[in-house]
Amino acid sequence: MGENMIKSEDLVFKYVNAEEQTEKVAINHVSMEVKKGEFLVILGHNGSGKSTMAKHMNALLLPSGGKMYVDGLDTSDIENLWEVRRRAGMVFQNPDNQLVATIVEEDVAFGPENLGVDPKEIRERVDDSLKAVGMYEYRKHAPHLLSGGQKQRIAIAGILAMRPKCIVLDEPTAMLDPSGRNEVMKTIKEVNKKFGITIILITHYMDEAAQADRIIVMDKGEKVMEGVPREIFSQVEKIKSIGLDVPQVTELAYELQKEGVDISTEILNIDEMVNALCQLK
């Protein structure tokens, strides 16, 4: 992983509260970098600024101050908007709001058609994208008959068909059941590893965040923590003071350590917990 896919410099975003006629700062001088090919999670509770940050990454929102660069392109330059949105695709929380056609393959073709891609290549892109997310056999189905997890995979296929360099996912599993969440997370990781596409996942699920290469934690519009998952989640008290939880096994290790058990809090999954417990005398 070399150069940056996403870079913000001292980013500020303010919006006006129409009722109170006051300005609210949603992002307060945040600088961050996301390397090409990286899988980054941005964590934070409601109102932390994480979704506002995500919307800057494909120029749905533009900075009130500071800069946001997507693959080296300044999002504040109006001439860059089309190219920024082509390079950074976005998947939202509600799958039903993202599907536009009555047949799955037509929905996936919608983006490339709007880019003016040749029909023969569109056919190839649609098939390749549906295979990549494990939904090729549903290509002739009606999207509204699919499960929530399947719909989100179709939404991801629609972004893949546009050949982006980066996909920003704003709480894509928030409305899904556990099996749907697992389907979507598996797809996200495969897209990242197989195609080298940069992934930025906005979430408040700790087990999802634990699977990332790196985590940024936001609180009250500011970046308050940054590091690899083990580094972040081992700071249990700090995470809790921000109003977040840690993965269940990390919480268990923390409670055991408090009771005097010689165990690390840098435990992220059940296998690691089993190994750590087996080594205790």
Swiss-Prot record:
Keywords: ATP-binding, Cell membrane, Membrane, Nucleotide-binding, Translocase, Transport. Gene3D superfamilies: P-loop containing nucleotide triphosphate hydrolases. It is an enzyme of class 7 (translocase). Residues 6-245 form the ABC transporter domain. Its main location: membrane. PROSITE patterns: ABC_TRANSPORTER_1, ABC_TRANSPORTER_2, CBIO. Its EC number is 7.-.-.-. It is found in: Cell membrane. InterPro entries: AAA+_ATPase, ABC_transporter-like_ATP-bd, ABC_transporter-like_CS, ABC_transpr_CbiO/EcfA_su, ECF_ABC_transporter_ATP-bd, EcfA_1, P-loop_NTPase. GO terms for cellular component: ATP-binding cassette (ABC) transporter complex. It is a peripheral membrane protein. The keyword Nucleotide-binding applies. ATP binds at residues 44-51. It comes from the Bacteria. GO terms for molecular function: ATP binding; ATP hydrolysis activity; ATPase-coupled transmembrane transporter activity. PANTHER family: ENERGY-COUPLING FACTOR TRANSPORTER ATP-BINDING PROTEIN ECFA1 (PTHR43553:SF24), HEAVY METAL TRANSPORTER (PTHR43553). NCBIfam families: ECF_ATPase_1, PRK13648.1. Belongs to the ABC transporter superfamily. Energy-coupling factor EcfA family. ATP-binding (A) component of a common energy-coupling factor (ECF) ABC-transporter complex. Unlike classic ABC transporters this ECF transporter provides the energy necessary to transport a number of different substrates. Forms a stable energy-coupling factor (ECF) transporter complex composed of 2 membrane-embedded substrate-binding proteins (S component), 2 ATP-binding proteins (A component) and 2 transmembrane proteins (T component). This is Energy-coupling factor transporter ATP-binding protein EcfA1.
